[in-house]
Amino acid sequence: MKFTVEREHLLKPLQQVSGPLGGRPTLPILGNLLLQVADGTLSLTGTDLEMEMVARVTLSQPHEPGATTVPARKFFDICRGLPEGAEIAVQLEGDRMLVRSGRSRFSLSTLPAADFPNLDDWQSEVEFTLPQATMKRLIESTQFSMAHQDVRYYLNGMLFETEGSELRTVATDGHRLAVCSMPLEASLPSHSVIVPRKGVIELMRMLDGGENPLRVQIGSNNIRAHVGDFIFTSKLVDGRFPDYRRVLPKNPDKHLEAGCDILKQAFARAAILSNEKFRGVRLYVSENQLKITANNPEQEEAEEILDVSYGGTEMEIGFNVSYVLDVLNALKCETVRIMLTDSVSSVQIEDAASQSAAYVVMPMRL
């Protein structure tokens, strides 16, 4: 195996394929990248057995086919440490891979390519193409609600659901729920899968905001995404995700509307004096007015009074202020609509001008 490539053509692919690699690999070869040269292309692959990222680099200079695996971190650090515009010549000699550039020379240990694990072949059941911006919006709108190391393992991920000509993402940790739907050009069969948390983060990392469309394939145990020269595959979480439709409040009869930024700033200020552990704030809603209060064990108090649009009956309700702020940060809109029922029912929060995303937050007894 032999190839020569410019540093700039290698850096981004190396960074992307190193993404799935954890801190301390369980098997030594999982800390390595698979390098394969064939048909004028260099393929780089990184995996942690749960997911895999493949990058392709076109080789314009003379090369010889072959394959090997090298320590990912060291190879990336060497390439990154070389000066801009450097040409990198790589050659496999016995069980060593030689890397040369200018007057620098490195000899890396290798492990056989045949030992590198690859995800089993699988059949795709649903396929569709969408703009990168659409996928980015779907993930950004819901990502923060995923659970973190919950024993209900199926919550440590994101539900991707196709229905008609819509793609939907849902995430919940049992205290709050986020759902976002975006239209697709094609009509698709109804299908839903749970992508693990780490897979969602990697999928987000591969979106470069460019014009290249994203092609998605979903099988019974895997999801694959192609964009440009990158192919990402992740195993799915086996489990039953809660039905978000049953979590949305049934018929909230009280609607409050207010400016998103004004609300965000008021909640952020009140949060300073909320209990550091429980993060509780109280909301008092009356005609066209919202009062937010917070206090802590040191008997310190915060009070914010805002003019809002509200015509329902007076009520008070408590929330974890962090959950509300997460929603307001994700909404990025001008006016927010908050739909309330009573002090013990969850509320629904959405952009007043668009129904594409909805957020549900459970109340807190204060």
UniProtKB/Swiss-Prot annotation:
UniProt subcellular location: Cytoplasm
One Gene Ontology CC term in the entry: cytoplasm
UniProt keywords, alphabetically: Cytoplasm, DNA replication, DNA-binding, DNA-directed DNA polymerase, Nucleotidyltransferase, Transferase
Gene Ontology MF annotations: 3'-5' exonuclease activity; DNA binding; DNA-directed DNA polymerase activity
Any Gene Ontology biological process: DNA strand elongation involved in DNA replication
Record InterPro entries: DNA_clamp_sf, DNA_polIII_beta, DNA_polIII_beta_C, DNA_polIII_beta_cen, DNA_polIII_beta_N
CDD domains: beta_clamp (cd00140)
Sequence similarity: Belongs to the beta sliding clamp family.
Functional note: Confers DNA tethering and processivity to DNA polymerases and other proteins. Acts as a clamp, forming a ring around DNA (a reaction catalyzed by the clamp-loading complex) which diffuses in an ATP-independent manner freely and bidirectionally along dsDNA. Initially characterized for its ability to contact the catalytic subunit of DNA polymerase III (Pol III), a complex, multichain enzyme responsible for most of the replicative synthesis in bacteria; Pol III exhibits 3'-5' exonuclease proofreading activity.
Subunit note: Forms a ring-shaped head-to-tail homodimer around DNA which binds and tethers DNA polymerases and other proteins to the DNA. The DNA replisome complex has a single clamp-loading complex (3 tau and 1 each of delta, delta', psi and chi subunits) which binds 3 Pol III cores (1 core on the leading strand and 2 on the lagging strand) each with a beta sliding clamp dimer. Additional proteins in the replisome are other copies of gamma, psi and chi, Ssb, DNA helicase and RNA primase.
Name of the protein this chain belongs to: Beta sliding clamp
